[in-house]
UniProtKB/Swiss-Prot annotation:
Organism: Wolinella succinogenes (strain ATCC 29543 / DSM 1740 / CCUG 13145 / JCM 31913 / LMG 7466 / NCTC 11488 / FDC 602W)
EC number of this enzyme: 7.1.1.-
The organism's place on the tree of life at top rank: Bacteria
Keywords for the protein's UniProt record, in alphabetical order: Cell inner membrane, Cell membrane, Membrane, NAD, Quinone, Translocase, Transmembrane, Transmembrane helix, Ubiquinone
Complexes and interactors: NDH-1 is composed of 14 different subunits. Subunits NuoA, H, J, K, L, M, N constitute the membrane sector of the complex.
Protein task: NDH-1 shuttles electrons from NADH, via FMN and iron-sulfur (Fe-S) centers, to quinones in the respiratory chain. The immediate electron acceptor for the enzyme in this species is believed to be ubiquinone. Couples the redox reaction to proton translocation (for every two electrons transferred, four hydrogen ions are translocated across the cytoplasmic membrane), and thus conserves the redox energy in a proton gradient. This subunit may bind ubiquinone.
Catalytic activity: a quinone + NADH + 5 H(+)(in) = a quinol + NAD(+) + 4 H(+)(out)
Biological process according to GO: aerobic respiration
UniProt family annotation: Belongs to the complex I subunit 1 family.
Matches recorded under InterPro entries: NADH_UbQ_OxRdtase_su1/FPO, NADH_UbQ_OxRdtase_su1_CS
Protein name (database record): NADH-quinone oxidoreductase subunit H
């Protein structure tokens, strides 16, 4: 094998290992943050401050019985969780996580595939991930699962359009679909960040991201009070876990995308090196995702569609038109 292939394989293994662990650890962080905001303690008994709770949860998931309902389409039922988890990690392959660095005299580029349509690839693979909940709900032979699948299709397709339209305006300014080029466009300092020239695009992209991740207040796919666990109702054990590993991995990817698109990416921030700066910015957005879950109420499906098609979509189109006019002038 050529050195390039070996390096790519090593990068894939490192990304999958690190972000699988981070996705699991994020569940612990979420429980502690929610507990703090609700005046509770959260996990406390497994390890110091409950930090080993993720190991206990992992053992529980691996040892639980894997049940396939009698009325389910077994092949599709088993494939659906794999689609959700796989697309989450495939999307990461075009995301530049850090600036280049030297390791044992070799220059390492912390991106698996530096393609010139990086943002398009990430959004496209993320859209394919919709088939996970859709196939899971359709194949389960359960009415609650089917309702969850229907909600997943409507919600994710609708907000995928908003997500794509929202980033058109900043892409028009940059003139490239490459995430590295978008990062380099903001290399002049904090005042070159695209969030200052495209605040509406940032808000639209962030809201659409919440909806595509199935995060509060847009958690309609598996809302317990209405449709039990939605598309995941009939799942147990590690198959159930794969859905939520995919969800938290997508959350990390979205945080990186927001930072790369609007907040200077991995460019140095004053005296802070670029690698540390991007981690701090990503951590802020991950905390924001958890904070919103604790603070915001659940909304109805009709309200969600109204917001998408009658508020967010026109605003995204208006932003594109205004940006085009400004660029022409």
């Amino acid at each position: 094998m050529t050195p390039y292939i070996i390096e790519t394989i090593l990068k894939v293994l490192v990304v999958v290992a690190i972000f699988s662990a981070l996705a699991g650890f994020l569940t612990y962080v979420e429980r502690k943050v929610l507990a703090f905001m609700q005046r509770r303690l959260g996990p406390m008994h497994v390890g110091p401050y409950g930090v080993l709770q993720i190991l206990a949860d992992g053992i529980k998931l691996f040892t639980k019985e894997d049940i396939v309902p009698v009325g389910a389409n077994q092949t599709i039922f088993k494939i659906a969780p794999v689609i959700s988890a796989a697309t989450a990690f495939i999307a990461m392959s075009a995301v530049p996580f850090f600036p280049e660095f030297e390791l044992f005299g070799h220059t390492v580029r912390p991106i698996i595939a530096d393609i010139n349509v990086g943002i398009l690839f990430v959004l496209g693979v993320g859209a394919v991930g919709m088939y996970g909940p859709l196939l899971a709900g359709m194949s389960s032979g359960n009415k609650w699962s089917l309702l969850g699948a229907a909600r997943a299709t409507v919600q994710l397709l609708s907000f995928e359009v908003v997500s794509g339209l929202s980033i058109l305006a900043p892409l028009m300014m940059v003139g490239s679909l490459s995430l590295i080029e978008i990062n380099n466009y903001q290399s002049g300092g904090i005042f070159d960040w695209l969030v200052w020239s495209q605040p509406l695009a940032f808000l639209l992209f962030l809201i659409a991201g919440y909806a595509e991740l199935n995060r509060t207040p847009f958690d309609l796919l598996e809302h317990e009070a209405e449709i039990v666990a939605g598309f995941a109702t009939e799942y147990s054990g590690m198959r159930w876990g794969m859905f939520f590993i995919g969800e938290y991995a997508n959350m990390i990817t979205l945080a990186f995308l927001v930072v790369l698109l609007f907040f200077g990416g991995f460019n140095p921030l004053w005296f802070i090196p670029g690698g540390i700066a991007i981690l701090l910015k990503v951590a802020v957005f991950l905390f924001l995702f958890l904070w919103v879950r604790a603070a915001w109420p659940h909304i109805r499906p009709d309200q969600l569609m109204w917001v998408c098609w009658k508020v967010l979509m026109p605003l995204a189109l208006l932003n594109i038109v205004l940006t085009g006019i400004v660029l022409i002038l």
